[in-house]
Amino acid sequence: MSGFVVSKPEQSHHRLFDFAKTAIINIFAHPYATVCELYCGGAPETDKWEAAPIGHYIGIDTSSGISSVREAWESQRKNYDVEFFEADPSKDDFEIQLQKKLEQADLVSCWRHLQLCFETEESARRLLTNVACLLKPGGYFFGITPDSSTIWAKYQKNVEAYHNRSGAKPNVFPNYIRSESYMITFELEEEKFPLFGKRYQLKFSGDNASEDHCLVHFPSLIRLAREAGLEFVEIQSLTDFYDDNRAQFASLLMNAGPNFVDPRGKLLPRAFDLLGLYATFIFQKPDPDIEPPLTTPIPFESSNNHDERELPVITVITDASAPAEDPSQGLGKIVEQKGILGPGPADLRFSEAI
C-alpha cells in the first residue's frame, strides 16, 4: 500500500491548504512539462500533477523523507516518468550533486518549506540558487508560505492593544497571536521583524502538535531571488488569490468541504481566516531568447532589524511590447500582477511605489 495515497484531510486547514495547492497546480501545469517538487517527502502531489498530464516528475528531499516516498512509489504506476533524489535544497549545492538535472525543469514547486529556509540568509540563498539551477529559462518557481505580512500585522496590533491597557509593563511585549482557528507563539518577545531567524510555532485548533516556522521577510526573498537569477512575479494572499479566481475555483472549494463558502462562492469567516494565513509566491527564470526579462525592483537597503510597517509597495512593470504568454503553456490563467510586496492587510500597504 502506498505511503501517500490521497485521502481527504479531516481538519479544515488541511483541506483548505490542499484546495490551494490543487488550484495553483491547475494554473501552472501543462502537458508534458517537467516538474520538480522540493521537499516532496511525506505527500508528493503526484495525483494533482497527473491530471495535467505532465511528462516528467522529479522529487527532491532529504534522506529522512525520500526513502519512504521512493518505496511507496514502486507500488504505483503513473503516466509520466519519475525520479527521486536525496538532497537538501537549502544546504546542498545542486550544481555539484545534480549536474545532469540542471535547467531541466519547466516548473519547480515548494509547498511547505520555504519558511524553514529563512532560519538563516545562507540557507535561503542556497535554496533559491538551487531553484535557479534546476529551472529552464522561462520556467517558474512557485508555492505557498505563511503570509508574514498578515502574521506580523496581527502581532503588532496585539502589542498595541497590550500597551493600551492600563497597568501594562513598559518594554514588555506579548509573544503570541490567537484566533478562533489557530495560535501563533513567537520564541522571542521583540518589537522588530528581523530579516532571518524569526521563529514561531503555529498550532491549529484541533491539532495536537504545533508546527515550527520562520517568518519570511518578503523584501529579502525578492532580493535573494534576483541575485540567484529569478525575477519576482507575484506574492499574493490566498484570500486575494481565491477572490481573483473565484469563478474558476468556487466549485473546487465547495467540494473540499462544507462551510467554506456561501452559495455565491464567497469565503465564509473561518475559511477567510485560515486562507488569509497563507500566501502564494511566483518567480520566473527569464528567457532572454524569447523576451526581455522582467525588471524586479531592488528592495531598499535596511538594517538587519526591520519593522515591516516600513515596507513600501513594489510595483512590477512589464514591457508592453513584449509578446503575450502562450496559453498552451498553462499560464494564461495567471491574473495580472498585483505588484504588492507583501500580501497582508491593506492598511500596511503604502500608496506609492518607490
From Swiss-Prot:
SUPFAM superfamilies linked: S-adenosyl-L-methionine-dependent methyltransferases (SSF53335)
Record: residues binding S-adenosyl-L-methionine: 21, 61, 88-89
Family per record: Belongs to the class I-like SAM-binding methyltransferase superfamily. mRNA cap 0 methyltransferase family.
Site (mRNA cap binding): 48, 278
Chief site of localization: nucleus
Keywords: Methyltransferase, mRNA capping, mRNA processing, Nucleus, RNA-binding, S-adenosyl-L-methionine, Transferase
UniProt key word Chloroplast: no
Source organism of this protein record: Arabidopsis thaliana
Domain of life of the source: Eukaryota
Location of the protein in the cell: Nucleus
InterPro entries: mRNA_G-N7_MeTrfase_dom, RG7MT1, SAM-dependent_MTases_sf
Name of the protein: mRNA cap guanine-N(7) methyltransferase 2
EC category name: transferase
Signal peptide: none
